[in-house]
Regions:
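Bacterial N-terminal signal peptides
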Residues: 10-25
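Conserved beta-strand hairpin/beta-sheet module of binuclear metal-dependent hydrolase folds
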Residues: 36-87, 223-237
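Core dinuclear metal-dependent hydrolase active-site scaffold
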Residues: 37, 185-191, 195-227
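Active-site neighborhood of phospho(di)ester-bond hydrolases with catalytic His/Asp-centered motifs
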Residues: 69-71, 94-102, 123-126, 213-214, ...
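Active-site HxH/HxHxD metal-binding segment of metal-dependent hydrolases
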Residues: 86-192, 201, 296
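Active-site-proximal loop/helix segments of hydrolase catalytic cores
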Residues: 208-264
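Divalent-metal (often Zn2+) His-rich catalytic cores of metallo-beta-lactamase-fold enzymes
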Residues: 255-309, 313
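C-terminal regulatory/interaction regions
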Residues: 302-356
């Protein structure tokens, strides 16, 4: 099976958004996450910016243990969150949910199974489990094979850097990338152990957790995790604090899926990246953006525009409408155009019939 665009170049703007958010490199002993209480026994673990991307997590304390939504880019990151979880509860993690198959949301699964052998269920949609096995595992092999080139680039740039701040930054990136590759070489990917197609309900004491597949969106198997009593939603990357990342997305379905998710009664959303979202304004922003992106791209294609021409036309049309709105939502201004370009390429493939 061939490698897909999300594995390499197409993820670059999304990674850029993460890195540009960092004001300074984290010290080795600093936590990787800000663990924010958002309801009684419910925490948003907001990932601090790192060169090797981590996702956010939702931590839910249940009667018989803890449920965690998403496990980040590597076991060591998940281990870091496990240590932070132990500061707020002595209950074991019993359930881990993978919202979708992308690497930065599930490569830490093994840390939970190591911490509590035989006592953790890894839950996902059936579509996500299949994609983790068929695409996620080959991606790990691809990373091990290709990251050394990045390591050499970083080493060269760090050696040549004359500015001490720039050199320190590059040396930090180099160290982080070397550690990541070493960890991948020794990592055994742990696949979901429990899957479902439409919804799964977990009732533990007074807490009810709904796991919902509402339709195609960011991928073909996105899971929303909903706490009806607490009015909290975890959305993975189907809705997060920056721009949509569309390489594996289904834009027309995505709009409908967001509409269905929006009908749920929630006050807060913990997306895969960015800060906790209050209200439903981000849903409206994303739906509007997706509609306009597809309409402008379809218009350009119908007018005979090539992909290169569409990139320029659609970017110019959407920049005036959305650059300031996404910047206000937390996306660094420097990453708006690169992120938009990748999404235009996806939209063009859809309107031209190359993809759905």
């Amino acid at each position: 099976m061939g490698l897909r665009p999300w594995m390499t170049r197409a993820h670059a703007p999304f990674l850029l958004a993460t890195f540009l958010c960092a004001a300074a490199p984290l010290l080795a002993d600093e936590p990787l996450f800000d663990l924010k209480p958002i309801a009684e026994g419910v925490y948003a673990a907001i990932a601090r910016p790192k060169f090797i991307l981590n996702c956010n997590a939702l931590v839910v304390v249940l009667e018989d243990g803890v449920l965690v939504v998403d496990t980040h880019s590597k076991p060591s990151a998940a281990k870091g969150l496990i240590d932070q979880i132990k500061t707020v509860t002595d209950k074991p993690v019993r359930y881990v949910v993978n919202t979708h198959f992308h690497w930065d949301h599930n490569q830490g699964n093994a840390a939970y199974l190591s911490a509590w052998p035989g006592g953790v269920e890894v839950i996902s949609s059936e579509a996500t489990a299949e994609s983790v096995e068929q695409r996620g595992i080959p991606r790990i092999e691809h990373e091990i094979a290709t990251r050394p080139k990045e390591i050499e680039r970083l080493r060269t740039e760090a050696s040549a850097a004359k500015d001490p701040v720039a050199r320190l930054k590059l040396e930090g990136q180099l160290k982080e990338t070397e550690a990541y590759v070493a960890e991948l070489k020794n990592m055994q990917m742990k696949l979901p152990t429990m899957t479902f197609d439409h919804n799964l309900v977990l009732r533990r004491g007074p807490r009810t957790v709904l796991m919902l597949v509402l339709g195609k969106a960011h991928t073909d198997g996105d899971v929303f995790v909903f706490l009806p009593k607490e009015k909290v939603l975890a959305s993975g990357d189907a809705l997060q604090g920056w721009m949509p990342y569309m390489a594996d997305g289904h834009p027309y379905d995505w709009i409908r899926t967001l509409e269905d998710a929006q009908k749920l009664d929630f006050d807060m959303t913990v997306g895969g990246h960015g800060d906790v979202l209050r209200g439903k304004g981000q849903f409206e922003l994303w739906k509007s953006y997706l509609r306009d992106l597809m309409a402008e791209t379809a218009k350009a294609y119908a007018g005979g525009a090539s992909l290169d021409e569409a990139r320029t036309r659609v970017a110019d049309a959407l920049a005036t409408r959305y650059e300031s709105r996404f910047s206000a939502a937390g996306l660094p201004a420097e990453s708006f155009r690169p992120s938009l370009t990748g999404n235009i390429e996806k939209a063009y493939r859809v309107v031209s019939g190359q993809q759905d």
